[in-house]
Regions:
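Accessory terminal regions of nucleic-acid processing enzymes
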Residues: 2, 53, 57, 151, ...
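Charged, glycine-rich intrinsically disordered N-terminal tails and low-complexity linkers that flank
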Residues: 1-90
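Short, polar/flexible loop-turn hinges at active-site or ligand-entry regions and domain interfaces
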Residues: 35-39, 184, 255
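A residue-level signal for conserved active-site and pocket-lining positions in enzyme catalytic cores
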Residues: 23, 48-49, 163, 199, ...
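A non-catalytic, helix-rich entry segment at domain boundaries
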Residues: 51-144
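Hydrophobic/aromatic-lined pockets within catalytic cores
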Residues: 33, 56, 60, 178-181, ...
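Mg2+/Mn2+-dependent nuclease catalytic core
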Residues: 138-243
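Active-site-proximal structural scaffolding
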Residues: 10, 189-192, 196, 260, ...
Length: 293
C-alpha cells in the first residue's frame, strides 16, 4: 500500500527507509526500477495482513459491544467467516491468478486464528485478575487504530502502520510480518527496527503522544516481539531520511562488502542487483555466500 503513495518522488515511505537501512543499493533499486509482478509469498503475506487486521477489528467491536467475551464456538466461526469473506474478496480482485493458492491456505490460517483467539482470551483473563476493567483489558490487547495512514510534510514521509495501541504510557506501534523463516526475520531485523521507528516518529507527530515501544506480530506462529524505541533511534532514522534522499541524487550505491555481504543472500532483489554489477564478486563476498549455501 505504501508503494502507491511513494510515487510522489519527494515523499518516501517507512518501508523505503527500512530498505535503506538494510542496504542503500536496495533502496536505490526499488526507487528506480519496478517492483515486478506479485509472487506467491507476497500474495499470501498480503492476505494474512488483511485477515489479522480484520480479526482485530471485528473482535474488538464484538467483545466491546457485548461487554464480555462470548464463549461459544459459533461466535468465533461467524467472525472468521466474515473475516475470510472480506479478505478473499480483496484478494480475488487483486490477485485472481493466485486464488487457488489462497484457498489452500485457508485451513491452516483458520487454525492459527483459533489459537490466536485462545491467546487473546487468556490475555484478557490475566489482565482482569490484575485489576483491569474489561474495557481497559480489551483496549490493551486489541488496537486503538488499524491500518492508520500517515502523511508528514515535515519529514516528507507517507505510509500506513498496521496497528496502534493506546496505553497509559503513550502509543505502541505494530507491524504484521508473515515471515516463515526465523533466520530470514533475524537477518532483516535492522529493516524491521527502522520501519517501526519511522512509524513511531509519524505517530508522535500526528497524535501528539509519545511512542516508546514497538512490536512485531509474526502471523505464521502467532507470536509478538517487542522492543523499546529511544530518542537516539528516532534521531538516527531522521538522519537516514536525509541520507537516503542524497543517494537518489548521487546514483547507484556500491555493493555491500565484508560481513554485510551476507545480507545479499537474503535479499528479494538479489538477482536484479547482481545483474547490474559490472565487477566480479570479491573473494570475501564469495566465501560469505558459500558459507550460506
Amino acid at each position: 500500500m505504501e508503494v502507491e503513495d511513494e510515487m510522489r518522488y519527494d515523499h518516501l515511505t517507512p518501508t523505503a527507509l527500512a530498505n535503506f537501512s538494510y542496504c542503500p543499493r536496495l533502496f536505490y533499486l526499488n526507487k528506480q526500477t519496478p517492483y515486478g509482478t506479485a509472487t506467491e509469498l507476497t500474495v499470501i503475506g498480503n492476505f494474512e495482513h488483511d485477515v489479522f487486521e480484520k480479526y482485530y477489528d471485528f473482535t474488538k467491536v464484538e467483545w466491546s459491544s457485548k461487554g464480555e467475551i462470548p464463549n461459544t464456538q459459533s461466535s468465533l466461526d461467524e467472525r472468521v467467516s466474515r473475516i475470510f469473506e472480506f479478505a478473499i474478496n480483496i484478494s480475488r480482485e487483486r490477485y485472481p491468478q493466485f486464488f487457488d493458492i489462497i484457498q489452500k491456505n485457508l485451513a491452516p490460517l483458520r487454525y492459527r486464528l483459533e489459537q490466536f483467539e485462545l491467546q487473546k482470551k487468556k490475555n484478557v483473563t490475566d489482565l482482569r485478575q490484575k485489576g483491569f476493567s474489561f474495557e481497559d483489558a480489551i483496549n490493551t490487547i486489541l488496537p486503538w487504530k488499524i491500518e492508520e495512514k500517515f502523511k508528514s510534510e515535515k519529514y516528507n514521509l507517507v505510509g500506513y502502520v498496521d496497528a496502534i495501541y493506546l496505553t497509559n504510557d503513550g502509543l505502541v506501534v505494530e507491524d504484521i510480518k508473515s515471515h516463515n523463516d526465523r533466520l530470514d526475520a533475524f537477518i532483516h531485523r535492522v529493516e524491521h527496527t527502522t520501519q517501526l521507528t519511522t512509524y513511531a516518529i509519524l505517530a508522535e507527530e500526528k497524535f501528539r503522544m509519545p511512542v516508546k515501544k514497538a512490536q512485531i506480530f509474526y502471523s505464521q506462529d502467532i507470536h509478538y516481539e517487542s522492543f523499546k524505541i529511544s530518542n537516539k533511534m528516532k534521531n538516527k532514522v531522521i538522519n537516514q531520511n536525509l541520507d537516503a534522499r542524497d543517494i537518489l541524487e548521487k546514483g547507484m550505491p556500491p555493493k555491500l562488502e565484508g560481513q554485510d555481504a551476507l545480507k545479499c543472500q537474503f535479499c528479494y532483489r538479489y538477482e536484479k542487483c547482481f545483474r547490474k554489477r559490472n565487477s566480479k564478486l570479491d573473494e570475501q563476498e564469495l566465501l560469505a555466500m558459500e558459507a550460506l549455501n
